[in-house]
Regions:
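Alpha-helical transmembrane segments in inner-membrane proteins
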Residues: 2-353
Length: 353
């Protein structure tokens, strides 16, 4: 990160040049605190909600004495708690990766899917189901992460150029790699008859989350989130334009490289844990801009917290819509996200970075 530290002092004047603060510092802190409380409350609500029942009293007793948990308490401990934590973490990761992706490409329609992460993960999950059909779910998780990494490396290899202006090349490379890996995934699934077994994962679901997979991937998500927060001031500089960012002492290519690393770690870990969940990384950053403006030092943390809230509440709804059966939360988020996306698109202000 030594290279990224260059120009930190110069970046301090970005807010005056952007003129995009929509809230004062106290208002921003209030919004941040409200989102933290809302995220905590929604996660507790998720643990206490289900067809087997539950209450805050049982939740508190289970947290205080997990060894004594039984009945509903055991369901909370072994099934609902890892699911709620995974929803919060992956929702934060999807939204934060979307904000970072929009920052490094300077494209308000970008999200992690632009790097082919979902397509790469899906292709490798299909391969793992064919090659290791009896393997535990952790193998599928590792395969998904490996596929996401391969997709990002392919996009970066095709999209990187000799000049600083690489955003358009990345977009084209991402679209091409996504189309290729999606086609390969569909061909393999049809050829080996595994379409049905992969459909629930590809639609996005938190039903298969375990403490084991959560413990393996949560350090990745938390570390990448911290790196994304460190990048936020450089993303604000990049939003002014590549030449302006360079004049402020920001190494554009290095910021873009670290930004892609953040997106890979966040979205790759999340997709491997809960499957492909679209629209959170695209829509949540736009909603966050309406609250705190376009400065990424405010946009990144607010997007992360709001993404966690959105996915936790969506998962609660997905569990209760057709109880006792699970509705894929990715499908529900997409259904709710489309009208929100159109509403944001046709705002008079437009979608500005």
């Amino acid at each position: 990160m030594g290279t990224l530290s260059k120009g930190t002092g110069a970046v301090a004047g970005i807010s005056q040049r952007q003129g995009r603060y929509k809230r004062s510092a106290p208002a921003f802190l209030i919004i941040l605190a409200a989102l933290v409380l809302l995220l905590g409350y929604s996660m507790i609500l998720s643990v206490c909600t289900g067809i087997a029942g539950g209450s805050f009293k049982v939740f508190a007793e289970t947290v205080m004495s997990p060894a004594k948990a039984s009945g509903v308490g055991m369901i909370m401990l072994e099934m609902r708690m890892p699911r709620a934590l995974a929803a919060g973490l992956t929702g934060m990761a999807f939204a934060l990766s979307g904000a970072v992706m929009q920052g490094i490409t300077r494209n308000p329609l970008s999200d992690a899917g632009l790097l082919g992460i979902n397509a790469g993960a899906g292709f490798f999950v299909a391969l793992s189901a064919i090659l290791f059909p009896a393997a535990p779910d952790i193998v599928k998780t590792c395969a998904a992460f490996a596929g996401a990494a391969l997709a990002v490396f392919m996009v970066y290899g095709f999209g990187a150029g000799k000049h600083r202006s690489e955003s358009f090349r990345f977009i084209l490379a991402g679209a091409a790699v996504s189309a290729l890996l999606t086609a390969l995934s569909q061909a393999v699934s049809l050829a080996f008859g595994i379409v049905k077994s992969l459909s629930f994962w590809s639609a996005g679901s938190l039903s298969g989350v375990t403490w084991q997979s959560l413990k393996m991937l949560s350090p990745v998500i938390l570390s990448a989130s911290a790196l994304g927060l460190l990048l936020s001031s450089r993303l604000s500089a990049l939003a002014l334009g590549e030449d302006s960012a360079a004049s402020l002492g920001v190494n554009v290519r290095t910021v873009r490289l670290f930004g892609m690393l953040v997106v890979l770690l966040l979205a790759g870990a999340s997709v491997s844990l809960v499957g492909g969940i679209a629209f959170i990384g695209l829509i949540v950053p736009h909603i966050s801009r309406l609250l705190v403006g376009g400065d990424y030092r405010r946009l990144v943390p607010v997007s992360a917290l709001m993404g966690g809230v959105v996915l936790v509440l969506s998962d609660i709804a997905a569990r209760m819509i057709n109880a006792p059966f699970d509705t894929p939360v990715g499908a529900l988020v997409s259904i709710l996200g489309v009208p929100v996306f159109f509403a944001l698109t046709f705002r008079k202000e437009g979608m500005v970075l």
